[in-house]
């Protein structure tokens, strides 16, 4: 009892009747969102202009809300307009209609071609939608629908929001909405009916008018006039009289070898199917009244030819198959493969190659054998490679080869047109390499994409690889062609044949790496060819000198063995050059330094031309510019490798010194050439010519008072341990032709050939992908120029810009490259659509009777490509309308199996019209009914009422907005 009497032990149960329920929390959350979006109070908007729903910008914002554990998405849709609040805020009336109610009666934006379905059905410019979340079930039961609508009504009343608020109910695919809009003393209810079949009594205008009148229940007599807008849509799918403009290339002829090699340089273009699948004609009768038009179950006045407004939209085929896009896609697929050439072509071929190449591995041992009976040229490495190459080719040309001989020969002839010339003239032929105009678009394009010039060998190779991959065997054909290409490169190197289609000079670092490698090989061939030509002339000079008893003939630049004196120079192989160089290098190493210097003093060598103004400071003899070695050309991978090596040397003094010595090879060579050309010269003479800024002149007064100009080295040249001073002291007077080569063309050529031989098909296609994209862009530009499509031009600029950024990366991402190819395919489809429409409307042919009609048709076709829906000038009586009418008549006759007679079509006989209607039954009918009546009582305010009706073969939809006066009800 004591415990019970303790006041602290007593417990009081408190019931909090203010606790909010889940329903109240949901309503509160809706109100918070409306406040966040500033949708509270009255809205002011500018009057809607005609077509603004289509041309204007629609924006939206969304948030997530919950009713207990059920997720909803609330979205605000609105047409972006300039604010009109400052202009009309002072003029607002206290009981003004909400903006949405005013939009119900606006006739400037009926049937917008591209808008939200609620905009089309109810004509509102701003609204809010509450819909179930992505993974939530639909609101189907009537109780849940009523609960949501009650929540909406309460939230609108509490906040004073005048923006209509909709709730999505039923299954999402049915697009069923119910909503409400509240204003001061007024309310509009948005209701909807959706059926699968059209009830027979409502399959015409008169039945729908009955529904509308019964729903609004106007007590006035007579009933205020009802504004009627009607749109019938007719679909054309059969293009009977229109020939498809795309002419596919004759691939059978190409396979049979009947098409010349030039065909390999052309990328295909165009759609394989008609990219225009349907044409939708909308015949519109705006702003009719009930007594003007008759449409019931017995008779209808609604003839599309008599409609005052026509508009057309085209439906395009989804992802049409296009030739260029298919080429690019199949080519890109090879980039993702990992097989080597041996794995693709099979081990048998590789084994045969290894068997035949055994001669190459024994080449060096054969060269060292003491046998004198074997001619020197039979023992050379190059001849071994050449003979093995011939045997490999013989083994490859079997019926199992991916490429047959005819196709392969056509490709090689296209790649190397100089091969068709007489063999005696091949080495003398220099292909005409036309450098692109620096102002041309092509020049800047290959610069941007890091590809290659469009007239180069690499460009042609990319096109051939692309074609054989698509038409002649896929990746196996690619591997086969690449092997043949590498063999051709080796043949040209061995035989001093310049590579056709490559610009002379060092590798162009603006191009792709493969193009640089081929340019490097061409440089090697040029150097080797020039050296061999120089030796040929030296040998003839040496022979003449020996006949005169001149001792200089026995030098390293002599003719060589006496038994070769009567031998043609063309019969010498590369092995003799290589062997001769080894001997000459050995003799040069044995040569005494002092003897060489004495000889250089007595006879200057390697002079190019006198300088003109400078003389040697000590001897006052003219200063001669020497013949120097050209610096070694390098590709970007070699430059990167060299920079990495130099960077690894570090920043220490020893590392810096070693780095300077590595970079001074060219300087030392130039010093030796300068000494040979200018006996008795000094370092000051060399610096004065080679680096004028390091030669400092100053005026000095001698003992006799005469002013002289004397020169000296700059301060940096006087630093102890200067690399220039060390190099000058070690440099010998040796002309460039007797120096050790800065650029070993034999070594570099073999490195390039080895690099090419190791390329997998996937690596090859990655190298050539910029060239293929470059060719595709040029092809699209060429095709677009004939069509004059501004949208395509702007798209091409964007594609070029994005592709250049991607391809500049050493390892571009495949996903981004796929996006570029997809964009090119989309542009190709646009051009194909333009050609299809021009063919259908007779723009390309000579069918148009008057020039002004042709111009109007061209503008009409261009608009169809750019806009979602295009108005037809003159409706059915204009130039475009006449063509559309003929298209439908032709389709109708074909559908009814009646032969088409052109004369009857032109005359349009009445009997024929009765038998065969010009248009099929409309695929869709849209009827819009509007009026303004007092509701619910005769003395209520006159408020807008609207009913939008959609009648299709498998759908019947009524979307109504019915307003009522709530002041006293």
Curated annotation (Swiss-Prot):
Subcellular localization(s) per the UniProt record: Cytoplasm; Endoplasmic reticulum; Golgi apparatus, cis-Golgi network
Ranges of Low complexity composition bias in the record: 550-572
One Pfam family hit: Rab3-GTPase_cat
Gene Ontology MF terms: GTPase activator activity; guanyl-nucleotide exchange factor activity
Taxonomic superkingdom: Eukaryota
Renumbered residue ranges of the record's region Disordered: 532-613
Quaternary structure note: The Rab3 GTPase-activating complex is a heterodimer composed of rab3gap1 and rab3gap2. The Rab3 GTPase-activating complex interacts with DMXL2. Interacts with LMAN1.
PANTHER family noted in UniProt: RAB3 GTPASE-ACTIVATING PROTEIN CATALYTIC SUBUNIT (PTHR21422:SF9)
Family classification: Belongs to the Rab3-GAP catalytic subunit family.
UniProt-recorded name of the protein: Rab3 GTPase-activating protein catalytic subunit
Source organism (scientific name): Danio rerio
Lineage of source species: Eukaryota, Metazoa, Chordata, Craniata, Vertebrata
């Amino acid at each position: 009892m004591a415990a019970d009497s303790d006041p602290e032990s007593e417990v009081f149960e408190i019931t909090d009747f203010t606790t909010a329920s889940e329903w109240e929390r949901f309503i509160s959350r809706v109100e918070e969102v409306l406040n966040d979006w500033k949708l509270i109070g009255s809205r002011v908007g500018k009057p809607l202009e005609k077509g603004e729903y289509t041309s204007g910008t629609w924006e939206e914002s969304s948030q997530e809300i919950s009713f207990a554990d059920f997720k909803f998405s609330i979205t605000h849709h609105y047409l972006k307009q300039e604010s009109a609040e400052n202009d009309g805020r002072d003029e607002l009336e206290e009981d003004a209609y909400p903006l949405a109610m005013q939009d119900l009666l606006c006739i400037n934006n009926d049937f917008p071609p591209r808008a939200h379905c609620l905009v089309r059905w109810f004509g509102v410019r701003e609204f809010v939608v509450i819909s179930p979340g992505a993974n939530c079930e639909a609101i189907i039961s009537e109780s849940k629908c009523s609960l949501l609508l009650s929540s909406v009504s309460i939230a609108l009343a509490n906040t004073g929001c005048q923006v209509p608020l909709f709730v999505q109910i039923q299954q999402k695919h049915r697009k069923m909405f119910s909503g409400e809009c509240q204003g001061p003393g007024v309310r509009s209810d948005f209701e909807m009916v959706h059926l699968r079949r059209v009830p027979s009594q409502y399959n015409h205008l008169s039945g729908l008018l009955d529904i509308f009148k019964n729903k609004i229940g106007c007590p006035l007599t007579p009933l205020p006039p009802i504004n009627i807008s009607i749109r019938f849509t007719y679909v054309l799918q059969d293009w009977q009289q229109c020939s498809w403009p795309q002419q596919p290339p004759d691939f059978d002829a190409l396979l049979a070898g009947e098409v010349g090699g030039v065909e390999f340089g052309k990328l295909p273009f165009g759609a394989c199917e008609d990219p225009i699948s349907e044409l939708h004609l909308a015949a519109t009768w705006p702003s009719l009244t009930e007594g003007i038009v008759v449409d019931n179950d017995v008779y209808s006045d609604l003839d599309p030819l008599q409609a005052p407004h026509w508009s057309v939209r085209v439906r395009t085929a989804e992802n049409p198959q296009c030739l260029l896009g298919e080429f690019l896609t199949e080519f890109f697929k090879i980039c993702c493969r990992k097989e080597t050439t041996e794995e693709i072509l099979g081990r048998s071929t590789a084994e045969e190659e290894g068997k035949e190449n055994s001669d190459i591995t024994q080449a060096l041992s054969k060269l060292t054998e003491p046998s004198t009976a074997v001619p020197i040229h039979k023992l050379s490495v190059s001849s071994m490679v050449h003979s093995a190459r011939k045997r490999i080719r013989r083994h490859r040309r079997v019926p199992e080869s991916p490429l047959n001989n005819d196709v392969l020969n056509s490709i090689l002839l296209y790649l190397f047109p100089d091969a068709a010339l007489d063999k005696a003239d091949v080495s003398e032929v220099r292909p005409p390499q036309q450098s692109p105009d620096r102002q041309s678009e092509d020049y800047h394009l290959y610069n941007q994409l890091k590809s290659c010039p469009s007239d180069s060998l690499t460009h042609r190779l990319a096109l051939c690889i692309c074609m054989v991959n698509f038409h002649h065997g896929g990746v196996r054909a690619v591997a086969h062609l690449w092997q043949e290409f590498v063999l051709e490169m080796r043949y040209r190197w061995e035989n001093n044949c310049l590579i056709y289609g490559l610009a002379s000079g060092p590798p162009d670092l603006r191009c792709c790496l493969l193009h640089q490698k081929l340019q490097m090989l061409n440089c090697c061939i040029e150097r080797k060819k020039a050296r061999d030509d120089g030796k040929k002339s030296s040998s003839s000079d040496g022979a003449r000198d020996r006949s005169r008893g001149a001792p200089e003939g026995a030098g390293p630049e002599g003719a060589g063995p006496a038994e070769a004196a009567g031998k043609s120079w063309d019969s010498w192989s590369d092995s003799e050059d290589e062997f001769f160089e080894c001997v000459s290098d050995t003799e040069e190493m044995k040569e005494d330094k002092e003897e060489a210097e004495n000889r250089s003093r007595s006879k200057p060598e390697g002079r190019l031309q006198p300088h003109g103004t400078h003389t040697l400071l000590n001897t006052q003899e003219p200063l001669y510019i020497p013949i120097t070695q050209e610096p070694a050309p390098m590709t970007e991978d070699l430059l990167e490798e060299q920079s990495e090596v130099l960077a690894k040397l570090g920043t220490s003094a020893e590392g810096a010194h070693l780095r300077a010595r590595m970079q001074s090879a060219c300087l030392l060579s130039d010093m030796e050439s300068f000494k040979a050309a200018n006996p008795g010269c000094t370092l000051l003479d060399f610096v004065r010519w080679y680096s004028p800024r390091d030669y400092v002149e100053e005026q000095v007064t001698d003992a006799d008072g005469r002013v002289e100009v004397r020169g000296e080295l700059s301060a940096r040249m006087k630093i102890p341990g200067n690399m220039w001073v060390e190099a000058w002291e070690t440099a010998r007077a040796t002309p460039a032709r007797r120096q050790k080569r800065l650029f070993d063309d034999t070594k570099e050529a073999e490195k390039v050939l080895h690099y090419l031989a190791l390329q997998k098909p996937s690596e090859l296609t990655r190298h050539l992908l910029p060239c293929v994209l470059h060719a595709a862009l040029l092809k699209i530009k060429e095709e677009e120029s004939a069509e004059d499509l501004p949208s395509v031009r702007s798209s091409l600029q964007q594609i070029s810009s994005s592709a250049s950024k991607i391809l500049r990366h050493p390892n571009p991402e495949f996903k981004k490259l796929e996006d570029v190819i997809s964009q090119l395919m989309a542009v190709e489809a646009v051009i194909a659509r333009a050609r299809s429409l021009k063919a259908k409307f007779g723009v390309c042919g000579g069918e148009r009777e008057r020039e002004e009609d042709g111009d109007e048709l061209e503008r009409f076709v261009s608009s169809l490509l750019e806009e979602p829906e295009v108005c037809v000038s003159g409706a059915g009586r204009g130039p475009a309308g006449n063509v559309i009418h003929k298209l439908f008549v032709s389709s109708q006759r074909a559908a009814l199996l009646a032969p088409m007679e052109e004369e009857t079509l032109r005359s349009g006989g009445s009997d024929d019209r009765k038998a065969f209607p010009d248009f099929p039954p409309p695929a869709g009918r849209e009827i819009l009914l509007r009026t303004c009546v007092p509701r619910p009582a005769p003395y209520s305010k006159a408020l807008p009422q609207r009913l939008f009706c959609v009648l299709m073969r498998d759908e019947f939809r009524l979307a109504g907005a019915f307003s009522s006066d709530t002041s006293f009800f």
